[in-house]
């Protein structure tokens, strides 16, 4: 097998079986008042808080219509889900402002030596036409973490003022 170079890849976030899955690490960062978000080795956001700007993402809409928005987060080392966190998501004419992350569900230890992922449904958005859509996600308020286990220090030196976003899912709502 011989591959031609340069290799051509497609990094667009496309629909698969009615779901558009948009990894946080596929986005770019818009700096905030006190710095900017970075990405951790697992592709999650790092140091994402109200002062570090917003995450800019894109996806391809094949089927215009209404989509449910799910936001996936991962636990921050030995801290549990941050109760009371609020986010804002903007796309086109849709603004889901100051939405509470409620932990609608949890995927337990999906990767070896990892922490559980949680998801929160934050609302619905409508895309009236096909094509590339831009999405902006920002953190309005960080909730309160409770500790898990017995470690007193944060292994990566991050503050508790931080939410780890993994991905956004847009789920097409059939009529």
Mark where each language-model region is.
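Extracytoplasmic
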Residues: 1-175
């Amino acid at each position: 097998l011989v591959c031609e170079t340069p290799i051509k890849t497609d990094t667009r976030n496309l629909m698969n079986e009615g779901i558009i899955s948009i990894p946080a690490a596929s986005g770019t960062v818009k700096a905030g008042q006190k710095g900017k978000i970075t990405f951790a080795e697992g592709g999650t956001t790092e140091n994402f808080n109200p002062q570090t700007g917003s995450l800019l993402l894109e996806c391809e809409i094949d089927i215009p219509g209404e989509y449910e928005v799910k936001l996936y987060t991962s636990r921050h080392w030995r801290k549990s889900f941050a109760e009371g966190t609020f986010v804002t998501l903007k796309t086109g004419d849709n603004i889901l402002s100051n939405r509470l992350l409620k932990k609608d569900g949890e995927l337990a230890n999906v990767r070896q030596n990892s922490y559980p992922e949680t998801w929160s449904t934050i609302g619905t958005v409508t895309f009236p036409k096909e094509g590339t859509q831009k999405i902006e996600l920002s953190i309005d308020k960080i909730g309160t973490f409770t500790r898990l286990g017995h470690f007193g220090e944060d292994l990566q030196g991050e503050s508790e003022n931080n939410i780890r976003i993994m991905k956004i899912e847009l789920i097409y709502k059939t009529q």
